[in-house]
Every structure is written in C-alpha cells, then in structure tokens.
Amino acid sequence: PGLTLAIDEVAKFEMVMETARKAIHDFINDEPDDVKVYEMEHPDVLLWAVWCIQQYAKMVSRDQCREKYGTLLQDIMEYLRRENHPNLFLHSNGLLYANGTEKAITWMNSTANGRPVIPRTGYIVEINALWYNALRFTSELLSEGGNNNLADALNVLAEKTGKAFVDTFLNE
C-alpha cells in the first residue's frame, strides 16, 4: 500500500493484489502454484494480505473494497478459522499458535546451519495482533455488506481473541 495507494496508484495496487489473489487462492486450495509468492506458507502472510486490503478500504472506499476483495477476505478468514493453514493453529482461547522451531517464520528470520537463530513458537504477539485486526476489519466490512452470518461468527471470535490477547501479552 505504501508504494501504491499512498501515492494514488490505485490501479497498480489492484494489479499487485490480483497477483496476490491468485497466489492466495492456489495456496489455500492446495493447488499448484500458478503464481509464485515467496514465503506464502509463512503464518503471517495471509494476515498481512488482509491488512493491505484494509488499507485499500481506507484509501479508496469500503464499498469498493468489499466488492473487489470481499470474497478473498471471506476465503482467507474461513481458511484460518477452520485451521487449514499448515502452521497456524486456532486455539480455544481465540489466539493463533505457530511453530517456528525448525524454520524461521517471522520477521526475525535469521538462520544458522539451516535453523532459526531465534526460534519463535507459540502465541506470537504480532501474528495475533494482525489476527485480531483481521477479525475486526473483516467482520465489520462483511456486516456492512449484509453477510451477517460470517460477520457475526468473526465478531464473536474477535471478542474471545481480544480478551485472550490482553490476558496473554504483557503491556507495561
């Protein structure tokens, strides 16, 4: 968004997101890569995609965002909610758990001898912040468009996630 939307390059953003949409579709449907996006399997990639779409909604319009990316948002959120991601596990408290013991999975991705220098496993704060944001944004956007079933389910999950986030992560 910073390289496109921030300078009114909406068409370029949409072009990039079309490539991302294809890659995300292939990934979540376990289909051969029609388009290759580096590290698509990492736990935060789909959540960052939702954040990018949220920036589009802010800069362009929520209605246009829902029309253009509503189905993609639904697909991403259902994929994560149903625990289909190979390295994101939705726990009963609403938080996402990821395993980074064998492979670096966050921005702290330095490796030595093929293993993470800083293995990050468990409830990773930035992943869960993105998750909570994705739940709230998608719930609101879908509700505005009349998709209340999924919107309500995401909102209930967001309530649970928000409470667990505050209980789990120290904020001093």
Language model: regions and residue ranges:
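A generic structural motif
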Residues: 7-9, 123, 138, 145
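Active-site oxyanion-binding pockets that recognize sulfate/phosphate
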Residues: 63, 121-122, 148
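Acidic/Ser/Thr-rich, low-complexity mid-to-C-terminal regulatory regions of eukaryotic proteins
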Residues: 105-130, 136
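Intrinsic-disorder/low-complexity, polar/charged segments
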Residues: 9-10, 120, 172
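Aromatic-rich carbohydrate-recognition surfaces in CAZymes
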Residues: 1-99, 125-128, 132
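Amphipathic alpha-helical interaction segments
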Residues: 56, 115, 139-140
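Catalytic cores of carbohydrate-active enzymes
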Residues: 81-93, 97, 130-172
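Carboxylate-rich helix-loop segments that flank metal/cofactor sites and access channels
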Residues: 92-112
